[in-house]
Amino acid sequence: MAEKEATVYIVDVGKSMGEKRNGRSMTDLEWAMQYVWDCITATVATGRKTATIGVIGLKTDETSNELDDDPHFKHISVFTEIQQFLMPDIRRLGALVKPSETDKGDAISAIILAIQMIVTYCKKLKYKRKIVLVTNGQGWMSNEDLDQITKKIKEDNIDLVVLGTDFDDPEYGFKEEGKDPRKAENEALLRGLVEDCNGAFGTLEQAVSEMDIPRAKRVRTVATFKGFLQLGNPEEYDTALRIPVERYYRTYVAKPPSASSFVLRSDVGAEGEQGESSQLPKSPPEGGALTSVRNLRTYEVPDENAPGGKFDVEREELAKGYEYGRTAVHISETDENITTLETYAALELVGFIQTDKYDRYMHMSTTNIIIGQRGNDKASLALSSFIHALFELECYAVARLVVKENKPPVMVLLAPSIEPDYECLLEVQLPFAEDVRTYRFPPLDKVITVSGKVVTEHRNLPNKDLLDAMSEYVDSMELVDTDETGNPVEGLPIDDSFSPVLHRIDSAIRYRAIHPDDPVLPPSKNLTKLSQPPQDLVEKSKAYLQKLMEAADVKKVPPKVKGRKRIRESEKPLSGLDVDALLHQEKRARISPTNAIPEFKQTLTQAETIETIKDAVKQMTSIIEDQIKNSLGDANYDRVIEEMGVMREELISFEEPALYNDFLRQLKDKLLKEELGGDRRELWWLLRRSQLGLINQRESDQSDVTEEQAKEVSLRCHLSSRGIY
């Protein structure tokens, strides 16, 4: 179970916090709230009820706290009591955090109030307590009873963090020039208090700069298996080995938050929901005009005698079936129990394998660790002996794992892991024989002819110069750095490598929670730095890359020729032969309805004038209309859609969109007037679904149809008889 947390943020909202200083484009309050919002949204994103937050406003115009009778606590307001923070709380807090019209208010008194809030809320329970003060250090601060404050903070194990705008921090390397004497005095006062409490004192610039570094989420792992590591059957043999062990995740895939579906809330839907329960509130819930999408699943069975040809059945009346090919095979519960393998939870050793005989590609899962039962020294000692035996013999163990009774067994590999203060078994899943697929690929260093001859020099094989050039280029791109003494160090430490998807989505969600109307900021450089090689390596390897390009005879592909397709020079084959000339292909005059698409393309390819293209379109129009007119129901609809799609694509390529647009307008007019074999409005719905509308200016520069005009000539048609819209 996660630790309980209680954090109180004290935010200085004084008049001076609304000013811009030291060349910054934002006020001190906006700058400070970047850090506060980042901390609050990170806590809200966890969704934990045990992670609670309280917020106090310092130097507010009014006073609102339980100690407001004392003059020391004037101009201090409790914005939010300690509680679990949710989205509505973030919205309310955003409206409260504004610069005030005064600089009166004691930061030390605000810390005392925060201590009082934590003591009242946490009582004597086990909590992780924390107070964060963000201020610019202006105004008056009391230095009375600092010893008592320090004593109380230590007694209750409260972490005190003080961050100041433009506070001096020698460790970070920042010092404000020309500092106001009152601010310097307040800085010294706060620094002394924090040091006496063993807290953290720093400048806000460092805290804001570290926000770009993604935070790895630390989770408290839970045992996925508790049982025995055994060798032999203990029920039959007294010599069987049994060691109580526990299994935990070593690595686990972190997944970003999944998307949720929402729809606009309607008054009709709200009234309908209220009619179902008289206990629902009449006022709209938090979240405004959106409501979540709820799925409703119904099961229907065909029945000619039922209204609509179907009748509904309850889920309880259905029988479970499995797909075998395209056939649904029913299996009763009795028969299904027979297919269930009866197993019991255990980790049974079945064999051993030398480390050099095992291939790493056999891994089929993330890694787990096996340790001795917690609190059982005898089990830990026995498992340690087994681990050292595997290590000394350079062996891995193969075991059969059943994590829970009647669960399917899996085969796992157990590898010893010995560190100075920690020993365990690393466990990874192995494939069954049915999981292994064997594929044969041609060799990369030779070519075997049909007759069996082995060829080592071939146009598809790299020669020695190319191999040497590639080797030198790869060596020049080595991602290894050196320290001051010249010793190699890891150039890409795993702790500095972050998942762009995971942390980008997380930061975007948290930013959108605070700024619902602003565009999301670009991703952090810490996430994008690995998307391209380091610039110094690129410059270093430039000469080797040029040598590699010369050895491989790399040539730049000419840009795609723009212009009308019919006046372009036809692409020449590598052989240099004109296939059409060799076959003496004659120019086509008529397009056959049985082979319309290939012959239409061929006619356009051979076209030398616009009249030839118009004639081909006219023939295709006649063929399409004839197929629609003679279609029995929707028998020819798929063919018509395919032909229209080809016509549309080809006329875009030949930059003649007007021919297609004129054809489409005429076709729509005939269909709506039922001149092509009756009611064919369903075809329009299919054309709309296939996106075969007018060619607009975005698709072709030669078109005179705008996107708005294309939408006006809508393909949507009301099919009331079929219930399709």
Curated annotation (Swiss-Prot):
Which locations, inside or outside the cell, does it occupy? Nucleus; Chromosome, Telomere
Spell out where the chain crosses the membrane: none
Any GO molecular function: helicase activity
Organism, as annotated? Aspergillus fumigatus (strain ATCC MYA-4609 / CBS 101355 / FGSC A1100 / Af293)
Example of a GO cellular component annotation carried by this entry: chromosome, telomeric region
Quote the InterPro entries the UniProt record gives. Ku70/Ku80_beta-barrel_dom, Ku80, Ku_C_sf, Ku_N, Ku_PK_bind, SPOC-like_C_dom_sf, VWF_A, vWFA_dom_sf
Per the entry, what this protein does is:
Single-stranded DNA-dependent ATP-dependent helicase. Involved in non-homologous end joining (NHEJ) DNA double strand break repair. DNA-binding is sequence-independent but has a high affinity to nicks in double-stranded DNA and to the ends of duplex DNA. Binds to naturally occurring chromosomal ends, and therefore provides chromosomal end protection. Required also for telomere recombination to repair telomeric ends in the absence of telomerase. ku70, of the ku70/ku80 heterodimer, binds to the stem loop of tlc1, the RNA component of telomerase. Involved in telomere maintenance.
For this protein, what reaction is catalysed? Answer: ATP + H2O = ADP + phosphate + H(+)
* EC id: 3.6.4.12
**Which GO BP terms, alphabetically?**
DNA recombination; double-strand break repair via nonhomologous end joining; telomere maintenance
Q: Where is this region: Disordered?
A: 267-290
Annotated protein name in UniProt:
ATP-dependent DNA helicase II subunit 2
Extract the coiled-coil ranges from the record.
none
Q: What is its main location?
A: nucleus
Key words, A-Z: ATP-binding, Chromosome, DNA damage, DNA recombination, DNA repair, DNA-binding, Helicase, Hydrolase, Nucleotide-binding, Nucleus, Telomere
